Amino acid sequence: MKAISITLLVGAMAAAAACSSSSTSPSASIAGTYVLSSVNGESLPAIVTKTGDDTAVVVADTLALTANNTYTRHAVDTLRSEVSGVTLYSHVSSGTYARSGSSITLTDAVTDSSATGTIANNAITISSVENGFAVTGVFTKQ
């Protein structure tokens, strides 16, 4: 089975962000470092998909948002297979983000794909469908 990327944000998964205060006002800065704290309600490491003998697990995901509306994301996932054992995958992606009120849209620089999320109380929630599976990730500001 090909590796299942835990791409919570689109475009090799653009990343997410949160407010630097509990405010979601458009003027609140969201620049900073964010860490994926849960996937589908589970703390990391979290199983995202299980298909046959293969299990995709999110191990870690870090996101850096800059004040000039760019981001870099580094995700670490594993694919556990009865046939080939455990394979570790490290994904780095980058792009731009735009904020409108409590919404954020991230656009991958390579694929030009985008994802949207909701910002609230120093966290952003992104929901997507990855390889046919519903995935909801919450990133929290550090």
Region annotations inferred by a language model:
Residues 14-18:
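C-terminal motif of bacterial Sec signal peptides marking the signal peptidase cleavage site
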Residues 1-8:
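Bacterial N-terminal signal peptides that target proteins for export
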Residues 20-142:
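Lipid interaction determinants
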